[in-house]
């Protein structure tokens, strides 16, 4: 009976795999290879989500996640983060995400935090506190809003991408610099634009350049992250993304560092990760990880994490430190 209930819960809560189809989404199709890659990523995310929704406990989901193809496993952990956060946000939900992060999911902590943001996009706002309770890292919590922004751009593309909607007075996190929330959401929208544009750098850049100039730095950062972590682009296309970004190429590189660091931490570095990190950032994935770690430590040492509406969170200082660190590498003899 219990297994029947878990299967029913999975059927009720899990979106159809068709939701990852580029044609269903109305996304640009660059070529069959890119389409296959992007759709496989979406399907793997939904698989991880389903594992979490159906699991008796996080350890059971972890065992199944570890059996998935390694190069896509990070997306499955992201989906599982969403699934467990949805369960935490429901009545009598529990603390599934916290328990999940005590295992192998800690290697994918960036992805799990992003998954929490997906869950928030699906839950009523009065459930957000429960769903996001495990996002206790004061720096990484902004990745939750990155996930929220990705979800909105992926599933509500016309409103958030083509009509460039921006949510006013975003209420989460309650104790963070209020004005920064929209920037973190834009970083997620930029990540989604890589998918909306079918991993075509010209299409992605055209979509980003249609936004107000004040938003483009964060959007290009997200695109750089997706181009490095998700891929589906060759060397010439990665160079085209950097060229089209123009003055925002440092932000593309910063996003690439985040992606390289995330894959290196999880032990999921692919040949594409190395290629993209080198072309967009000028570093190896291991160097990206080292730079991310040292930059975060420096940011935390100089930030009091002000809570006022005009404050700059440590997360943003971290991103700026990465940009300056890359600049120093370029000028070093």
Locations of regions flagged by a protein language model:
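Mature, well-folded catalytic/scaffold domains that follow N-terminal targeting or propeptide regions
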Residues: 1-333
């Amino acid at each position: 009976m219990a297994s029947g209930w878990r299967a029913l819960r999975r059927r009720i809560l899990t979106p159809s795999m068709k939701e990852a189809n580029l044609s269903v989404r109305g996304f640009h199709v660059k070529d069959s290879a890119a389409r296959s890659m992007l759709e496989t990523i979406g399907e793997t995310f939904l698989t991880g989500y389903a594992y979490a929704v159906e699991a008796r406990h996080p350890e059971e989901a972890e065992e199944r996640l570890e059996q998935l193809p390694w190069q896509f496993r990070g997306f499955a952990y992201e989906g599982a983060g969403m699934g467990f956060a949805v369960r935490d946000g429901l009545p009598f939900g529990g603390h599934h995400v916290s328990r999940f992060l005590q295992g192998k999911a800690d290697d994918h902590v960036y992805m799990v935090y992003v998954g929490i943001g997906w869950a928030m996009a699906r839950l009523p706002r009065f459930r957000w506190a429960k769903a996001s309770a495990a996002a206790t890292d004061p720096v990484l919590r902004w990745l939750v809003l990155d996930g929220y922004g990705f979800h909105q751009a992926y599933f509500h593309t016309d409103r958030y991408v083509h009509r460039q909607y921006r949510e006013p007075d975003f209420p989460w996190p309650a104790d963070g610099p209020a004005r920064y929330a929209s920037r973190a959401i834009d970083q997620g929208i930029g990540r989604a634009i890589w998918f909306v544009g079918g991993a075509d750098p010209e299409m992605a850049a055209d979509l980003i350049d249609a936004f107000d100039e004040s938003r483009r730095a964060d959007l290009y950062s997200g695109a750089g992250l997706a181009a490095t972590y998700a891929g589906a682009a060759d060397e010439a296309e990665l160079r085209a993304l950097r060229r089209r970004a123009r003055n925002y190429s440092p932000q593309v590189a910063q996003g690439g560092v985040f992606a390289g660091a995330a894959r290196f931490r999880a032990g999921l570095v692919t040949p594409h990760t190395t290629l993209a990190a080198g072309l967009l950032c000028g570093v190896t994935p291991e160097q990206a990880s080292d730079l991310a770690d040292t930059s975060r430590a420096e940011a935390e040492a100089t930030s009091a994490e002000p809570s006022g509406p005009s404050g700059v969170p440590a997360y943003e200082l971290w991103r700026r430190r990465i940009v300056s660190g890359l600049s120093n590498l370029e000028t070093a003899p």
